[in-house]
UniProtKB/Swiss-Prot annotation:
Functional summary from the UniProt entry: Transports adenosine triphosphate (ATP) and possibly other nucleoside triphosphates (NTPs) from cytosol to the extracellular space. Mainly regulates their levels locally in peripheral tissues while playing a minor systemic role. Prevents abnormal ectopic mineralization of the joints by regulating the extracellular levels of the calcification inhibitor inorganic pyrophosphate (PPi), which originates from the conversion of extracellular NTPs to NMPs and PPis by ENPP1. Regulates the release of the TCA cycle intermediates to the extracellular space, in particular citrate, succinate and malate.
Region (Disordered): 458-492
A GO MF term: ATP transmembrane transporter activity
Subcellular location: Cell membrane
Connected disease: Defects in Ankh are the cause of a generalized, progressive form of arthritis. In ank mice hydroxyapatite crystals develop in articular surfaces and synovial fluid leading to joint space narrowing, cartilage erosion, and formation of bony outgrowths or osteophytes that cause fusion and joint immobility and destruction.
Any one biological process term the GO annotation gives: phosphate ion homeostasis
Expression (tissue specificity): Expressed in heart, brain, liver, spleen, lung, muscle, and kidney of adult animals. Strongly expressed in the developing articular cartilage of joints in the shoulder, elbow, wrist, and digits of the embryo.
Bilayer disposition of the protein: Multi-pass membrane protein
Upper lineage: Eukaryota, Metazoa, Chordata, Craniata, Vertebrata
Protein name as annotated: Mineralization regulator ANKH
Phenotypic consequence of gene deletion: Mutant mice develop early-onset osteopenia in long bones associated with diminished bone strength. They show widespread calcification of soft connective tissues due to almost absence of PPi in plasma.
Keywords annotated in UniProt: Cell membrane, Membrane, Transmembrane, Transmembrane helix, Transport
Source organism of this protein record: Mus musculus
Extracellular side, ranges: 107-131, 180-189, 348-350, 427-429
């Protein structure tokens, strides 16, 4: 067997990240399979794609914050009691999300958000609200899955997490194929992707829960002892989680905001519907080469030696922060290469859209420029993921909150200003998303610099204090000093 000594320190990182990267790519493939389920409906395919895209992006806004509870499981859950607290938080969050789904589907609030704000016609608006109602139970299932995924990642079961996500996608593809041959294609085409989404989530959630009970439940204590930092409180979990949730919520609300401004910019015409459909098709394809980079933020908490549970579990771990930095840079370079190969090589991106999603060539050509803009996303995404992981390790996530605010400000500013420069449609949407990413990453970098300076100053103060203590220790006892002084006085 050929061995590579230079890669010895990187194999644990590769084994950990590859399944997570596959997970992220698998999710994008799942979205494309769902889009194909709609595109296969020849009648009103563009309208159906736009309706589902609006509903799905709004739903992701609610499920986004819950998926970040994966990081709570990764950092905080050391016992059965900790897990019970994390699950309780997610049950409450899932119930709240379901209530919001119902309100938007049936109340005037939903009519205003979807029909009025997005300037879509009555047909698209009613289909979108109906799809949103059908998706009401999804946030709860997604939350349960991500909570257990975080616990599994803490114990280095990233392969199992990856298998669960791949099973999710396989289930989606299979059920899309089955339902396309059912009566739903004629009666309620929207249910084809939605039911497939539910079946995939059910498979993923079941796999992760069974994996937890088989591999982890019996080996973790009922309560966390002092060597593991004690029991985590719900307050600590929520204090750690809310900045990450806010960031992910702004990331997820970015798509609905983009859809809103793009649709309003084109006046709710057929061109607006086409632009939203293009965005719906290009999001998963454009996200595929760089989306897995976000999983880099799980590397620091999983391998950091200052984490009490890692000290116990990884006594032979030789991964250092320098190895993590080099590994992160290589991942970014790989992602950039993939983006430029996929989106700048002639006819490759069109072929992906035609073969995977099932759109026609004319529609695929309209997606080329937005996809090329996605080529520049890996740089800000890598910077954000790497620094976020470091801050998660220090449990200093509160400094990340301003980055989400700046992202929204930059995003909306771009959506308002770029049309005056002649940029419209899907190009306007993706270009503004890139500007938002750059703004967010810049703020995360500034926050990391602030924390680094505080940590450095704290270490210097501790070193100075230890030096003073050492000097005091080297001094002779007070009684001895007194005796010496008295002896000198007697001699004089």
């Amino acid at each position: 067997m050929v061995k590579f000594p230079a890669l010895t320190h990187y194999w644990p990182l590769i084994r950990f990240l590859v399944p997570l990267g596959i997970t992220n790519i698998a999710i994008d493939f799942g979205e494309q399979a769902l889009n194909r389920g709609i595109a296969a409906v020849k009648e009103d395919a563009v309208e159906m794609l736009a309706s589902y895209g609006l509903a799905y992006s709004l739903m992701k806004f609610f499920t986004g914050p819950m998926s970040d509870f994966k990081n709570v499981g990764l950092v905080f859950v050391n016992s059965k009691r900790d897990r019970a607290k994390a699950v309780l938080c997610m049950v409450v969050a899932g119930a709240i999300a379901a209530v919001f789904h119902t309100l938007i589907a049936y109340s005037d609030l939903g009519y205003y958000i979807i029909n009025k704000l997005h300037h879509v016609d009555e047909s698209v608006g009613s289909k979108t609200r109906r799809a949103f109602l059908y998706l009401a139970a999804f946030p709860f299932m997604d939350a349960m899955a991500w909570t257990h995924a975080g616990i599994l990642l803490k114990h280095k079961y990233s392969f199992l997490v990856g298998c669960a996500s791949i099973s999710d996608v396989i289930a989606q593809v299979v059920f899309v194929a089955i339902l396309l041959h059912s009566h739903l294609e004629c009666r309620e085409p929207l249910l084809i992707p939605i039911l497939s989404l539910y079946m995939g989530a059910l498979v993923r959630c079941t796999t992760l829960c069974l994996g937890y009970y088989r591999n982890i439940h019996d080996i973790i204590p009922d309560r966390s002892g002092p060597e593991l930092g004690g029991d985590a409180t719900i307050r600590k979990m929520l204090s750690f989680w809310w900045p990450l949730a806010l960031i992910l919520a702004t990331q997820r609300i970015s798509r609905p905001i983009v859809n809103l401004f793009v649709s309003r910019d084109l006046g709710g015409s057929s061109a607006a519907t086409e632009a939203v459909a293009i965005l719906t098709a290009t999001y998963p394809v454009g996200h595929m080469p760089y989306g897995w980079l976000t999983e880099i933020r799980a590397v620091y908490p999983a391998f950091d030696k200052n984490n009490p549970s890692n000290k116990l579990a990884n006594t032979s771990n030789t991964v250092t922060s320098a190895h993590i930095k080099k590994f992160t840079f290589v991942c970014m370079a790989l992602s950039l290469t993939l983006c430029f190969v996929m989106f700048w090589t002639p006819n490759v991106s069109e072929k992906i859209l035609i073969d995977i999603i099932g759109v026609d060539f004319a529609f695929a050509e309209l997606c080329v420029i937005p996809l090329r803009i996605f080529s520049f996303f890996p740089v800000p995404v890598t910077v954000r993921a790497h620094l976020t992981g470091w801050l998660m390790t220090l449990k200093k996530t509160f400094v990340l909150a301003p980055s989400s605010v700046l992202r929204i400000i930059v995003l909306i500013t771009s959506l308002v200003v770029l049309p005056y420069l002649g940029v419209h449609g899907a190009t306007l949407g993706v270009g503004s998303l890139l500007a938002g990413f750059v703004g967010e990453s810049t703020m995360v970098a500034l926050a990391a610099c602030y924390v680094y300076r505080k940590q450095k100053k704290k270490m210097e103060n501790e070193s100075a204090t230890e030096g003073e203590d050492s000097a005091m220790t080297d001094m002779p006892p007070t009684e001895e000093v007194t005796d010496i002084v008295e002896m000198r006085e007697e001699n004089e």
